[in-house]
């Protein structure tokens, strides 16, 4: 049997997501190293205010640090993946896990990415689950500023676009569920061009 590690991206963050990681030697070292690189405490952001953690400049580095600590702990326990993948920001954790770059290099890349994306903030994203594909295509044609940001499966996609346009499109969707994502911008859309 093959093993794949798939790392999530922004929107998957949650207050308390460090769990018991600070109690491990690896966790303590990585959290201290991250604080030195970033100039602020990942642990404090992850255990503090949800709005503060939700800021892109904090969310992305926090997710990267937590994900890479988890990957390192699994590796230390003799578990290794046959494949790695990531969704958006999670690609950085996947690249780290594959040995493409070291922790510090990855964190510096993620920090820069987060600052650029936050500067281009504005807009919204939403996951759309079990939807009418024809109706979705019609809405995207009628509102070209709203784009299909992620085509995750035949039953789940993510839309991204300016807040006003998203607020017009989302209520019209024929879908089982529409879940607004906890992000500060219209990521994976033309609004990120400046980033």
Question: What name fits each language-model region?
Answer:
Residues 50, 89, 185-186:
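Positions that flank functional sites
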Residues 60-127:
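Gly/Ser-rich oxyanion-binding loop with an adjacent helix/lid
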Residues 16-18, 46, 93, 97, ...:
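Residue-level recognition of conserved structural "scaffold" positions that shape functional pockets
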Residues 10-12, 38-40, 98-195:
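Alpha/beta catalytic cores of group-transfer enzymes, especially the acyltransferase/condensing modules
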Residues 53, 92-93, 158, 189:
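Short secondary-structure boundary/hinge segments and terminal tails
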Residues 2-85, 159:
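Helix-rich "cap/lid" substructures immediately adjacent to catalytic or cofactor-binding pockets
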């Amino acid at each position: 049997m093959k093993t794949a590690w798939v790392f999530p991206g922004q929107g998957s963050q949650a207050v308390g997501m460090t769990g018991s990681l600070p109690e491990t030697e690896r966790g303590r070292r990585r959290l201290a190293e991250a604080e030195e690189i970033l100039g602020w405490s990942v642990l404090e952001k992850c255990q503090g205010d949800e709005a503060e953690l939700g800021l892109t400049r904090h969310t992305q580095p926090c997710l990267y640090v937590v994900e890479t600590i988890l990957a390192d702990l699994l590796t230390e326990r003799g578990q290794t993946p046959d494949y790695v993948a990531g969704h958006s920001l999670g690609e950085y954790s996947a690249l780290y896990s594959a040995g493409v770059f070291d922790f510090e290099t990855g964190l510096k890349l993620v920090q820069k990415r987060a600052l650029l994306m936050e500067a281009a903030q504005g807009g919204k994203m939403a996951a759309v689950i079990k939807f009418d594909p024809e109706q979705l295509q019609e809405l995207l044609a009628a509102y070209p500023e709203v784009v299909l940001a992620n085509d995750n499966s035949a039953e789940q996609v993510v839309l991204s676009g300016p807040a006003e346009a998203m607020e017009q499109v989302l209520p019209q969707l024929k879908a089982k569920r529409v879940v607004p994502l906890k992000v500060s911008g219209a990521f994976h859309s033309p609004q990120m061009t400046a980033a």
